[in-house]
Amino acid sequence: MSEPSSSKVKADSLLPPAKSTTAATAARSANGSTNTGASQLTKHGIELPSQEDAERLGFNVFSHILDPRLLRALADLGYGIPTPIQQKAIPLALAGKDILARARTGSGKTLAYGLPLLQKVLDAKSAVAKSDANHQLTRALVLVPTRELAEQVFRHLSVVIEYVRDDIRLVNVAREASEKVQRLLLSEKPDVVIATPSKALNYLQNASLDLKSGMESLAIDEADLILSYGHDADVKSLLGANFLPSHFQSFLMSATMTSDVSKLKGLLLRNPVVLKLNHDDEAASGSNLVQFYTKTTEEDKFLLAYVILKLKLIRGKAILFVNELERGYRLKLFLEKFGLRACVLNAELPINSRYSIVEEFNKGKFDYIVATDEPTGASGNMQDDEGDDEEEDADEREADEVDEQAEDQREAGKKRKSSEHAGAETKSNKSKVSQHRKGKNGASEYGVSRGVDFINVSCVINFDLPTSVDSYIHRVGRTARGGASGTALSFVVPSDQVGRSKYLYCASTTRDESVFKMLNKPSTISLLGSALQEWKYDSSSVAGFHYRVTDTLKSITKALIREARIKELKNEILTSSKLQSHFEDHPDDLAFLQHDKALLTSRAQQSHLKHVPQYLVPKIINPGAKLTKSSGSEYKGYVPKNKIKDGANDRKNKGGKRRSSTGKNTTGAAGKSRKKVDPLRKFSNK
């Protein structure tokens, strides 16, 4: 879909656009391929499928290098055409190359490294007799920055191995389970282990996890966040100590190229193939993200959120990102006052509850999530990514020009030196690592904007502008995933408006203009694929809602927010314990979980706010259209103070006569008696 030619965009344009190798591998390759299109030959002499073949054959274009059982599972899951990153990464990975891939979120990076990783496990086990002790070894480790992403990767790979479950076992040690249970699972030497760096290091140090005996592949997903999420000490200890074999294949998958990725590249990769998904590839995959911004005040943020959601200027599901936990609950309570159901996704909730919220949202049980994306580590610092592309091009040229054997020797020397240096530092780092885990482990392993796969999200609203370009890229990556279309809208507070409203003040707004300037740099626009367009709305058309919004915001006090947080946290802790035990045996009971239930008491709720009087509806809405309440009943313009009793013939409302057991006519309980009785007349003072 082409972008609007004018920078002035009408309010209704916020509607999202329409959706548009090993011996075994060599043996399969000898059987021939059905490809007939013009395949691409890389400078490494590896054949890549053409776009025409990929569109015609789907994942069967890899039939000569992937196990038929994996292809069958992909077909059952409805996977059609492999994405550009998958078309390039899978053949190169199965040829034994280290991969450094940069592609936007939602481009299919998980399968891009997951399929080669699983295929290598199948090939290795087929070459060893089952009676051999080396048949069952842990051959692959997948490191991710957050527990949510670990669970997501585990579930994605679990369905892909549907027809090879007898040959491949997966374990996710990032889950909240007792260490005794996890150690028991690891003692069986699962083929693939998925973990956060801190969890992996913990089990390596207590000898529960053995990677040195047989690990062949190491994949780091969301590599740009691994170090910035407070895992830097854990990663350095994991790579520097004597836990890993001397040779293994590495995959670094990232949405952005940062200094953290460069550090990991130097530590892990040997003569890597650098893959960068360009905008032509994104267009070929059908990605269509339209980005808007508007400059507004803190109070008007709530006004615009109300107008956009209540008047349904966007259709479908939406994620609203805030930078502070308290603001997340303030926004939820604010929307709740107007009858808009939403839930808050934040680091305070147990991991099972957080993942359950994502699952319910993906299933369509509610349409709006308020996600706290608090700046942590390097992500909280403003980063100027200008020059990243030049660094990548230089790195790629260097990787191509250097002779592979000389590079291997040099990297081996580096690893020996780093191993010796790390050995000397291990003792001094141990105390720091343990202190870091005690204080920050829970928060560092939470991240809703990074990697978590939200399904069919129509719009991302940056209620609070992120504090870095990288964070912005990850946030807007929650929509327009997998070839779908989506919209991103960002609220920017001008510097002269910062701090005007003390009770709505957000510290990160002091950086809004600086971050906004970085988002408009040519290098960032090139990375995003398009520039942000200004959304200019008619302020007079929404002025009538100001009094509603202002009064409602004043009613949401800090005490009310604190009570709501405590109430929800207690409920979610109970829910989480049930999820761990009871709901594993009774999955149908999950339907009774409601993570978006009201936090306000019935007295605090004002039912008239759930309706929009017809005289307030702006002209941008079709005058003939009828707005609907959250319950789905028909909208009525006039809302009286007292409830109107409908149905004149209804016995319950009318209070009609009924015959008692004695045969006398009595008045219905809901109706009024014909003769008023004064109780004081019958009162006798005896």
UniProtKB/Swiss-Prot annotation:
Keywords: ATP-binding, Helicase, Hydrolase, Nucleotide-binding, Nucleus, Ribosome biogenesis, RNA-binding, rRNA processing. Residues 20-36 have a biased composition (Low complexity). Residues 383-406 have a biased composition (Acidic residues). The keyword Acetylation does not apply. Its EC number is 3.6.4.13. PROSITE patterns: HELICASE_ATP_BIND_1 (PS51192), HELICASE_CTER (PS51194), Q_MOTIF (PS51195). GO terms for biological process: rRNA processing. It is an enzyme of class 3 (hydrolase). Residues 288-543 form the Helicase C-terminal domain. GO terms for cellular component: nucleolus. The keyword Nucleus applies. It catalyses: ATP + H2O = ADP + phosphate + H(+). Belongs to the DEAD box helicase family. DDX56/DBP9 subfamily. The Q motif is unique to and characteristic of the DEAD box family of RNA helicases and controls ATP binding and hydrolysis. PANTHER family: ATP-DEPENDENT RNA HELICASE RHLE-RELATED (PTHR47959), DEAD-BOX HELICASE 56 (PTHR47959:SF21). This is ATP-dependent RNA helicase DBP9.
